[in-house]
């Protein structure tokens, strides 16, 4: 008999060799009926998996993300099966589940049309109705290669696997696919599927490889859940920063400028400027000193920092090492420059902590397939910073960084949209990371202890660290469900040594400082994108590029309108007036479409009484208010950063 510890902490005994499904069934017929997959000792597994020793076990239903993933992964195979039925010459690539659905990549001479997607969806429903059996099996490498010999992408994937790795397949009726799983036991409970769209995608995400056709879809157990999801997708389209940001004239792009190089228009630039001034003032209030460093440096600097060895492919290099005496590169990070500033003078323990901040323009050579609007770009502006601390100061300063970030998030109204990810190294990936296992383990243990002391609720992620140390990533989902890193805090164990940074301790001895890397508000472009989507372009008044719009009823009242503009502008309000000879109703509608927080209509009565007729986003038509009273209210709303 083996002991199985269930999610609720209870321990049950079972015969060795029972499957996860059989264990679920022994607990409850209903649980087995609703089960999609299991988690054994923290690892997601198939319900078919046999349990042969003492384990901890969770049974996952569709209510869990693991359960949703198993259902949608299974349906991605149904899509591939349908493609092979209708377009048998198509070659198969990969088909994983993703946050809100699944995709499958195909190599087809002619891309799938909208009509093709309709046919495929109908064929998928037909397959689900047939409810073919789902079987998992394993093969040795030579037999696996023989089975997949007509599928070049599958052959490549098999060859990529390590010699000792298990090569598993799933058979769905007459269709077989290379797959590690997990998959559901039966398609019968899946009542609602939808193919969303198709797009281009490079094989393995590498633009040097062939462009494939990716079909996105989703699946639910109930039609009502699918309908709710599709409604959310439509709302997301309306909020998409790529669409809304252009409509509101916040940013634009141009093919002659280049991909991943957005141009902030005056309104977008005003929002970023407002954020930047606020962040820099807040950092200085908390003891930061601001620096201004070059946009490029000689390769020598990046060789010291390790960027040249571990990050060169992500940098824009100016010159040829073989031909030029000096080779420069645009900076991907600010850290080497601020460390050079630190080393410009000797420091005592009394000088520490030193908190450097900088609004940094950075450059990263992202692949074309990765770039998206303001989220993923090649040039961006980062609220960068590095804290040089003693070992005794590390936890308190880390806490101070988090308090700053949490204050900024709460003020922006995005604190509830954030999740925390503790990003660790992969000891097998020595090309990506500095190869010092002892230092990695020590630093990761230190960060974990700090996070636990601060009661941060986080998940751990392997192979997501910076090359020089572990980090805490603050993740935010965009309207399409994709998770992006908005803020990051890192503990650096390597670069203080590489730059020979030191301080003199109280005993007069030279010591290495610890370094905390952090971005207080992250990349301004990405934060702007998140805020566009969060507020659907209707930013809080303090952040709105135009806070007030004055609309004279006719040109007879232009002089009074201009006096209102001057009065408020002199007090720092961002204000415009619309003097066009258009009907007032038209001008009001247009100002509303621009998401202007306050619209002030002025005519004969308002001019005579020094008033303004106020229309606000919150209260609509508020009637006539004395200009002084409105000014006081507006300035208070801006000063308190009311949302």
Swiss-Prot record:
EC number(s) recorded for this UniProt protein: 6.1.1.3
Necessary cofactors: Zn(2+)
UniProt binding sites for Zn(2+): 335, 386, 517
UniProt enzyme class: ligase
Cofactor binding mode and count: Binds 1 zinc ion per subunit.
Keyword Transmembrane helix in annotation: no
Region described as Catalytic: 240-540
Domain named TGS: residues: 1-61
Reaction equations catalysed: tRNA(Thr) + L-threonine + ATP = L-threonyl-tRNA(Thr) + AMP + diphosphate + H(+)
KW Iron (keyword) present: no
Entry-linked SUPFAM superfamilies: Class II aaRS ABD-related, Class II aaRS and biotin synthetases, TGS-like, ThrRS/AlaRS common domain
GO function terms (MF aspect): ATP binding; catalytic activity, acting on a protein; metal ion binding; threonine-tRNA ligase activity; transferase activity; tRNA binding
Gene Ontology annotations of biological process type: threonyl-tRNA aminoacylation
Source species, domain of life: Bacteria
Keyword line: Aminoacyl-tRNA synthetase, ATP-binding, Cytoplasm, Ligase, Metal-binding, Nucleotide-binding, Protein biosynthesis, RNA-binding, tRNA-binding, Zinc
A cellular component term, taken from the record's GO annotations: cytoplasm
Signal peptide annotation: none
Annotated localization: Cytoplasm
Family: Belongs to the class-II aminoacyl-tRNA synthetase family.
Cited function: Catalyzes the attachment of threonine to tRNA(Thr) in a two-step reaction: L-threonine is first activated by ATP to form Thr-AMP and then transferred to the acceptor end of tRNA(Thr). Also edits incorrectly charged L-seryl-tRNA(Thr).
Complexes and interactors: Homodimer.
Protein name: Threonine--tRNA ligase
């Amino acid at each position: 008999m083996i002991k199985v510890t269930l999610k609720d902490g209870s321990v049950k005994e079972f015969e060795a060799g029972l499957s996860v499904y059989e264990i679920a069934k022994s607990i409850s017929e209903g649980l087995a009926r609703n089960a999609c997959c299991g988690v054994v000792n923290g690892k997601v597994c198939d319900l078919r998996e046999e349990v042969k020793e003492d384990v901890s076990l969770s049974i996952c239903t569709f209510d869990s993300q693991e359960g949703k993933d198993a259902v949608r992964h299974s349906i991605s195979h149904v899509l591939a099966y349908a493609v092979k039925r209708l377009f048998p010459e198509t070659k198969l690539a990969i088909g994983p589940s993703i946050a809100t659905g699944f995709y499958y990549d195909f190599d087809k001479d002619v891309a799938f049309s909208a009509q093709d997607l309709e046919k495929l969806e109908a064929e998928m429903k037909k397959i689900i109705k047939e409810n073919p059996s789902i079987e998992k099996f394993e093969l040795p490498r030579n037999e696996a290669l023989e089975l997949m010999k007509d599928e070049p992408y599958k052959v490549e994937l098999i060859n990529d696997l390590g010699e000792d790795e298990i090569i598993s397949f799933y058979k769905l009726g007459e269709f077989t696919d290379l797959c590690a799983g997990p998959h559901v036991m039966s398609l019968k409970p899946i009542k609602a599927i939808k193919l969303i769209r198709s797009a281009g995608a490079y094989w393995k995400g590498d633009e040097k490889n062939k462009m494939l056709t990716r079909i996105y879809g989703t699946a639910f157990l109930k039609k009502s859940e699918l309908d709710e999801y599709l409604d959310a997708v439509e709302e997301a389209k309306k909020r998409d920063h790529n669409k809304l940001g252009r409509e509101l004239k916040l940013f634009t792009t141009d093919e002659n400028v280049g991909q991943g190089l957005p141009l902030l228009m005056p309104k977008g630039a005003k929002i970023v400027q407002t954020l930047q001034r606020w962040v820099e003032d807040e950092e200085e209030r908390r003891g930061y000193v601001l620096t201004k460093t070059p946009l490029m440096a000689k390769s020598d600097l990046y060789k010291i920092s390790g960027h040249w060895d571990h990050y060169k492919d992500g940098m824009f290099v100016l010159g040829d090492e073989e031909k030029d005496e000096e080779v420069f590169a645009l900076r991907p990070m600010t850290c080497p420059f601020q460390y050079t500033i630190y080393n410009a003078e000797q420091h005592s323990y009394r000088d520490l902590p030193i908190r450097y901040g900088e609004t940094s323009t950075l450059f990263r050579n992202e692949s074309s397939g990765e770039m998206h609007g303001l989220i993923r770009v090649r040039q961006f502006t980062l609220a960068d910073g590095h804290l040089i601390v003693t070992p005794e100061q590390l936890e308190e300063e880390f806490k101070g960084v988090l308090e700053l970030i949490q204050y900024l998030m709460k003020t922006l109204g995005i604190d509830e949209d954030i999740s925390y990810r503790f990003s660790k190294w992969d000891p097998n990936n020595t090309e990506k990371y500095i190869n010092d296992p002892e230092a990695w383990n020590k630093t990761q243990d230190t960060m974990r202890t700090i996070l636990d002391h601060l009661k941060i609720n986080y998940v751990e992620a392997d192979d997501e660290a910076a090359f020089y140390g572990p980090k805490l990533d603050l993740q935010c989902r965009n309207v399409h469900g994709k998770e992006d890193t908005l803020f990051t805090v890192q503990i650096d164990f390597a670069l203080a040594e590489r730059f020979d940074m030191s301080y003199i301790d109280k005993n007069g001895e030279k010591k290495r400082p610890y370094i905390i890397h952090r971005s207080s508000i992250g990349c301004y472009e990405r934060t702007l994108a998140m805020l566009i989507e969060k507020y659907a372009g209707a930013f809080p008044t303090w952040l709105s590029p135009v806070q007030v719009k004055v609309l004279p009823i006719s040109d007879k009242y232009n002089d009074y309108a201009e006096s209102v503009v001057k009065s408020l502008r002199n007090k720092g309000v961002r204000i415009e007036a619309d003097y066009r000879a258009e009907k007032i109703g038209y001008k009001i509608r247009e100002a509303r479409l621009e998401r202007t927080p306050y619209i002030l209509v002025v005519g004969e009565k308002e001019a005579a009484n020094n008033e303004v007729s106020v229309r606000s986003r919150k209260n609509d038509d508020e009637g006539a208010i004395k200009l002084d009273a409105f000014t006081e209210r507006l300035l208070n709303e801006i000063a308190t950063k009311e949302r």
